[in-house]
Regions:
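Acetyl-CoA-dependent GNAT
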Residues: 8-80, 84-86, 97-99, 132-136
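Short, high-confidence coil segments that cap the C-terminus of an alpha-helix
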Residues: 52, 105-107
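Structural preference for beta-strand elements that scaffold enzyme active sites
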Residues: 75, 107-109
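Conserved acetyl-CoA-binding loop-helix of GNAT-fold acetyltransferases
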Residues: 83, 89-102, 121-125
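Conserved N-terminal entry element of GNAT/NAT acetyltransferase domains
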Residues: 1-12, 145
Length: 145
């Protein structure tokens, strides 16, 4: 695998990150339990307001992934880790997680859709475990630092 390059995301990346997030919401969220349109507006605002905290991952100049690692009151939160579909199962997610683990000076937590078995397996391989089921469709996973 060619070397990955980690660069700050820019305003140009907002729509790509939003589209990846929207795809997961449409795939895993229960539309009967919430106003999906309102949730998607909140997500877009969150991404736009925090784009400076996001990282764009490139391989040989091509965008292959995005993530946001930010300090919070409860440790570090890993948010919106997305590896583009055509680049999955090649170790990119693992390399990003290893980088985040080494950058974080405390525990790391994240929210994951309960139905996203591939992501859950990836996180478990890197020492994360479920600490709370927050809804029928989402859980919090944590890795202590």
């Amino acid at each position: 695998m060619p070397e990955l390059t980690f660069l700050p995301a820019t305003d140009e990346d907002v729509s790509a990150i939003y589209d990846l997030c929207k795809d997961l919401v449409n795939r895993y969220e229960d539309p009967a339990s919430m106003d999906i349109d309102r949730v998607l507006l909140w997500i877009l605002d969150k991404i736009q307001s925090n784009i400076a905290k996001y990282t764009c991952v490139r391989e040989a100049g091509e965008k292959v992934a995005y993530y946001c690692l930010a300090e919070s009151n409860d440790g570090w939160e890993l948010d919106d880790l997305y590896v583009l579909a055509q680049h999955r199962n090649r170790g990119i997610g693992s390399e990003i997680l290893e980088r985040c683990i080494s950058e974080a000076s405390a525990s790391i937590f994240l929210y994951v859709f309960t139905g996203n078995a591939g992501a859950i397996r990836l996180y478990e391989r890197h020492g994360f475990s479920c600490v709370q089921q927050v809804s029928k469709t989402r859980q919090i996973m944590r890795r202590d630092g």
